[in-house]
């Protein structure tokens, strides 16, 4: 077996990174966008970024969101994952220094955990809605049948 000198190895890219990229863009793109915007607000409000730089990053994020066609975007190996795809777009538009500043004071683990919590919240909310519907139906049925005899 020949050694592969660059990242990612084609097998790893095909079997791990490409499916992860597809999943991230399909299920988590909106969460990535919300996290980026919330983090940008924090960076500006704490003075880590000045208003002008924060504004330029916000405009670039708006442009990226408006221009990206997630259905057409495929994993190419140019970047490791969806996180780096957005970062690469910011750097392309704003330069490497300003484009990289959005990631000041956070880690990919922070982002991953936040995304998973956001996705879990959606599922919990849906389950709670179903439980409320079931509880209402059971209460309605109990009230409708309150004079019915139940034979044991």
Features from the language model and the residues they span:
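A helix-coil-helix interface module used to build multimeric assemblies
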Residues: 1-152
């Amino acid at each position: 077996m020949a050694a592969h000198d660059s990242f990612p190895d084609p097998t790893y890219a095909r079997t791990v990174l490409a499916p992860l990229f597809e999943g991230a863009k399909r299920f988590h793109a909106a969460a990535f966008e919300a996290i980026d915007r919330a983090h940008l607000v924090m960076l500006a409000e704490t003075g880590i970024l000045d208003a002008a730089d924060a504004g330029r990053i916000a405009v670039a994020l708006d442009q990226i969101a408006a221009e990206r066609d997630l259905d057409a975007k495929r994993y190419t190996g140019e970047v490791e994952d969806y996180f780096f795809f957005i970062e690469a777009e910011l750097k392309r538009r704003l330069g490497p220094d300003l484009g990289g500043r959005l990631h000041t004071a956070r880690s990919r683990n922070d982002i991953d955990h936040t995304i998973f919590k956001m996705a879990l919240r959606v599922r919990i909310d849906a389950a709670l809605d179903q439980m409320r519907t079931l509880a209402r139906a059971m209460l309605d049925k109990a009230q409708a049948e309150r004079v019915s005899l139940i034979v044991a």
